[in-house]
């Protein structure tokens, strides 16, 4: 599958990348080769194969939630350089 140099330039622009003409040509060839390789999956007979989200079966081991005592807020905030009630005061970043 061929990807045009114009498509590479478009994706580079979306990603805010400045590519040289040589890089555009190189990425066009490389992405085309990758897409050709992935396209080989279309030749595989998948008749009767059940879809899967993992290569091996995965089972989640859930447990019941248990309420536990938490750390005392004064102890948790004891190393905070600046605080107000149970909140840590931080410099404004915006």
From Swiss-Prot:
GO terms for molecular function: asparaginyl-tRNA synthase (glutamine-hydrolyzing) activity; ATP binding; glutaminyl-tRNA synthase (glutamine-hydrolyzing) activity. InterPro entries: Asp/Glu-ADT_sf_sub_c, GatC. Keywords: ATP-binding, Ligase, Nucleotide-binding, Protein biosynthesis. It holds the Pfam family GatC. It comes from the Bacteria. It catalyses: L-glutamyl-tRNA(Gln) + L-glutamine + ATP + H2O = L-glutaminyl-tRNA(Gln) + L-glutamate + ADP + phosphate + H(+); L-aspartyl-tRNA(Asn) + L-glutamine + ATP + H2O = L-asparaginyl-tRNA(Asn) + L-glutamate + ADP + phosphate + 2 H(+). Signal peptide: none annotated. GO terms for biological process: glutaminyl-tRNAGln biosynthesis via transamidation; regulation of translational fidelity; translation. The keyword Cell division does not apply. Its EC number is 6.3.5.-. SUPFAM superfamilies: Glu-tRNAGln amidotransferase C subunit (SSF141000). Allows the formation of correctly charged Asn-tRNA(Asn) or Gln-tRNA(Gln) through the transamidation of misacylated Asp-tRNA(Asn) or Glu-tRNA(Gln) in organisms which lack either or both of asparaginyl-tRNA or glutaminyl-tRNA synthetases. The reaction takes place in the presence of glutamine and ATP through an activated phospho-Asp-tRNA(Asn) or phospho-Glu-tRNA(Gln). PANTHER family: GLUTAMYL-TRNA(GLN) AMIDOTRANSFERASE SUBUNIT C, MITOCHONDRIAL. Belongs to the GatC family. Heterotrimer of A, B and C subunits. This is Aspartyl/glutamyl-tRNA(Asn/Gln) amidotransferase subunit C. The lineage of its organism: Bacteria, Pseudomonadati, Thermodesulfobacteriota, Desulfobacteria, Desulfobacterales. The gene is gatC.
């Amino acid at each position: 599958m061929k990807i045009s140099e114009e498509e590479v330039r478009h994706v580079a622009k979306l990603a805010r990348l400045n590519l040289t003409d040589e890089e555009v040509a190189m990425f066009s060839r490389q992405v085309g080769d990758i897409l050709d390789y992935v396209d080989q999956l279309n030749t595989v007979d998948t008749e009767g194969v059940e879809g899967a989200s993992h290569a091996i079966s995965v089972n989640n081991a859930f447990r019941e939630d248990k309420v536990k005592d938490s750390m005392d807020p004064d102890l948790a905030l004891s190393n905070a350089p600046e605080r107000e009630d149970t909140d840590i005061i931080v410099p404004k970043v915006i």
